[in-house]
Amino acid sequence: MTTAATKAPERLHYTGDDESDRLLAGDPLALLIGFALDQQVPVQKAFSGPAELRRRLGHLDAGRLAAADPGQLDEAFRRRPALHRFPGAMARRVQALAAHVVERYDGDAARVWTDAADGADLERRLKALPSFGDMKVRSMLAILHHRFGVRLPGLEERLPQHPTLGDVDSPEALARYQEQKRAHKARLRAEQGAGG
């Protein structure tokens, strides 16, 4: 079996905040939580969430998050400034994600990829994560390959052919990625408007 993480980056340039960017690179659960929060908010807001949640709770431990009182976790998400546009729903998602990591990987989020047998297995493991749809899975595959050096048989053929967060290696690259994403969405809206 070929293994996964051969090199963790020093930081992932997703937030503009050095502490948050370092946490994303150094704590696999933080990275997964950032992806769980990456919905209907800017990338910077979503991926800043894990560091702020750690400040509010004093930890980012999968077992403690999974076992937390849902009301207390909800309060941590709602405290101003709220961690997300939909704090209650995201508190539940993060708790479900933590529970999944505890149940399947003994609380070690890195095992999602370090224990994967090949690209297909890694893709299955990511798809099984609560709140991870196809776009998030493809983006995670690219990040793991490009930023963490994960090399598994059959992984390269699963990598997306379009820009993803996996291509972001600097604040400038994040700005380019976000501009490309906005332009793509504008094209889709224009095509839908022309067809209707």
What are these regions (language model features)?
Residues 32-36:
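Short, aromatic/basic-rich helix-turn unit that serves as a nucleic-acid recognition element
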Residues 38, 95, 99-102, 145-149:
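Amphipathic alpha-helical core segments of compact helical bundles
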